[in-house]
Amino acid sequence: MPLVSLSFASSSSKAMALCSICPRIPLRFRPKPISPFLSKPQICLAYRVYSSLQSTTPSTRDELGTVSIGFLGMGIMGSPMAQNLIKAGCDVTVWNRTKSKCDPLVGLGAKYKSSPEEVTATCDLTFAMLADPESAIDVACGKNGAIFGISSGKGYVDVSTVDVASSILISKQIKDTGALFLEAPVSGSKKPAEDGQLIFLTAGDKPLYEKAAPFLDIMGKSKFYLGEVGNGAAMKLVVNMIMGSMMASFAEGILLSQKVGLDPNVLVEVVSQGAINAPMYSLKGPSMIKSVYPTAFPLKHQQKDMRLALGLAESVSQSTPIAAAANELYKVAKSYGLSDEDFSAVIEALKAAKSREA
């Protein structure tokens, strides 16, 4: 197997590494179809990775305002992301299936259009943040979808979390119009979205990445360009698979500490100061101990991402027994009516299992 080549460069102002990774063995995705739009082709993706851990030079409010921005999807993530663009002085047009969710944005100065088609017809650059692959495909390609308004010279940036095949499908439909496409799923939940601290995992047309960069910097703290479409989606699924597995294990630890007579609050302090520290523990732990789950990332979305990640793993014959076990736990939690609670509510599935055993 040939070696992977690595090259590094530094800037005079700040230390920055650019890592170019060119594996010779293609990554083969054979995902299961999740919609009637999809078939079962084998897709080979070669990829090149670039990381940006610092913002690009900020544009002035006047410069930002020269690019008309569309934003589709005013949910728990889309709304704060669009708000940050508006507050930065961007010219923003919004759409959501439930019109009332657009009202706060219009109150801040956004325009409203009644369909994705109308948004892309009037905007230079359109972002889409939808709940799942089916919604992302429908908004882009369905009746009055984005593809019917977009055209050459414009760009479509899908920041939804979808599977690889769905992202490639949307990309093809967008690019068939002459427009450019970038997938840019985010790492981060409600609070990072509100604070403009998201991490963007982008792939697709490099010119669109460069055009969108100032707007990504408004909504996020860092961005990674991962090459061809599909790599951003794959990276996001791997990240969320790890996160979901960590949360399930953390929930077990909280309950075990209580069972043996330890103070779970002290457990949270201990893990937060050690080698396994993750912000998630100190952020979620106290509310989990109180059985309160304010929604930052809905449990149903975490389980959806676990399902998609397991499908990705199966497509390349990668064993993921830990993630598979965690996925079953999230499915149990959904069956208890916890779908719209924060994903930390997965602890309730473990409590129920303990009660049944007793």
Curated annotation (Swiss-Prot):
The keyword Lyase does not apply. GO terms for cellular component: chloroplast; chloroplast stroma. Signal peptide: none annotated. Its EC number is 1.1.1.79, 1.1.1.n11. NADP(+) binds at residues 70-84, 161, 304. It holds the Pfam family NAD_binding_11. Induction: By cold and heat stresses. Down-regulated by ozone. It comes from the Eukaryota. Residues 1-44 form a transit peptide. The active site is at 236. It catalyses: glycolate + NADP(+) = glyoxylate + NADPH + H(+); 4-hydroxybutanoate + NADP(+) = succinate semialdehyde + NADPH + H(+). InterPro entries: 6-PGluconate_DH-like_C_sf (IPR008927), 6PGD_dom2 (IPR013328), 6PGDH_NADP-bd (IPR006115), HIBADH-like_NADP-bd (IPR029154), HIBADH-related_NP60_sf (IPR051265), NAD(P)-bd_dom_sf (IPR036291). The keyword Cell cycle does not apply. One of its GO terms (molecular function) is NADP binding. Optimum pH is 6.8-7.8. The ratio of NADPH/NADP(+) may regulate enzymatic activity. Keywords: Chloroplast, NAD, NADP, Oxidoreductase, Plastid, Stress response, Transit peptide. Although GLYR2 acts as an aldo/keto reductase, it has no significant homology with either mammalian and bacterial NADPH-dependent SSA reductases. Catalyzes the NADPH-dependent reduction of glyoxylate to glycolate as well as succinic semialdehyde (SSA) to gamma-hydroxybutyrate in vitro. May function in redox homeostasis and play a role in oxidative stress tolerance by detoxifying glyoxylate and SSA generated in glycolate metabolism and GABA metabolism, respectively. Belongs to the HIBADH-related family. NP60 subfamily. This is Glyoxylate/succinic semialdehyde reductase 2, chloroplastic.
